């Protein structure tokens, strides 16, 4: 499992290609998260919700994500129709799907449906908002491979302030379920990364701290020097 996972929030197809090119050229990167925001469950809408016809055209054309031979793509589905949208990203070569429990009416049914259609080659994870009760994910732990705690109160956009409530959420969850990999997404920086790792986080999902750095590659290298005792 990757300790540092760059996250990209695309505003357009062109923006997605440019942001992926920035990270996929780095030898140390073997996993990238793509944020997908529908403008309803979270806002503002990102690509492809900002241009739905483009997504359909890419699926029909058989487009694939770059460097699938060495990079695993994880799709963070901040949308109410995650089941439908997931199929398009899987056709592009994504192998990890993160569903937000608050966006799904019937989580067990969704997970079972996705698993029955796509098998075990994909990794399914559940994300939970900072204000939500972890019981929402705990009843589904047998069907997923990882949990994502949101480190910000307002999801769907990068650059939001880190919410320290996530420290206690992670601590308690990891103590109760040490076998489940935990990742934190939102507000991750060098100021809080070491503490998150010490509490049991396996992967740091990092967006704005890399995107807004003058040198993203150098910023990534600093994060990669961190050490985690939990499965990395």
What are these model-derived regions, one by one?
Residues 23, 34-35, 89, 147, ...:
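Conserved, mostly hydrophobic/aromatic
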Residues 42-51, 130, 136-177, 215-225:
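Glycine/Thr-rich beta-alpha phosphate-binding loop at enzyme active sites
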